[in-house]
Amino acid sequence: EENETITPDTNTGSYYSYTQDKLFALLSDTSSTVLLSASLQDEISDVGKRGCIVGNDGNWDYLYSEKTGLNTLGLGWVHSYMYGAYAVMLYIPDPETGTVKTAIFKWLDAGWQKINMVKAHHIRGGIERFAASMKSVLESPDLPEVSEIVDKHEELLQKDEGELRQLVAPYLESIGTGKDAKSCPSHFITSVTSGEYLQQMDSDEIIRILLLEYIKTHIGDRAPETAADRVPVNTLGQQSS
């Protein structure tokens, strides 16, 4: 079982937290070994809260708030939820080319008043977004070794909250004063520039940002503004109900 908090949705700006069960299995035959990953949302998510994608989604910069609702005009009142999410992923190696093909099957039930508002194109967009980010990380020749990332994580865990706040402060300053600040509702940026956002962050959240920034500095160019420009997705695996 794992706790999951998704990044803000590209359509509504909302984000959700929930628990899910996850399974990994290796399926072997005489020619190759396929990795299977399956996930199942345990129960209804926490109520959707407002987040913001800062600038280009490919920059992986996000802000989160405790305000419920959607950023969509006229829907700030909505109490939305993820009622159920299920996914199956297959990683299929091709020994001849040295590449790995990935198949993703996704089912999602989300909305409000127990009505599923998810359409197939929403799922497709989410898959393209995920695939572009995964591809840019795994194919980077400068991706740190797993042991290096683990060591960096351990190093950050040893720091107290005051030290962590000092380390993440320059990042938040760049978010609040940068050219992409205008892409977020004003209350987000006001919270960042006033220092309120930093003071509300807990150690886990700060460490997630610092670790992500560590990886970003190593892998260089990342996902383009439109993930579909780079990652073709077959729609066979899409289901919205």
Over which residues does each language-model region extend?
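Terminal "cap-and-tail" regions of soluble proteins that handle hydrophobic small molecules
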Residues: 1-241
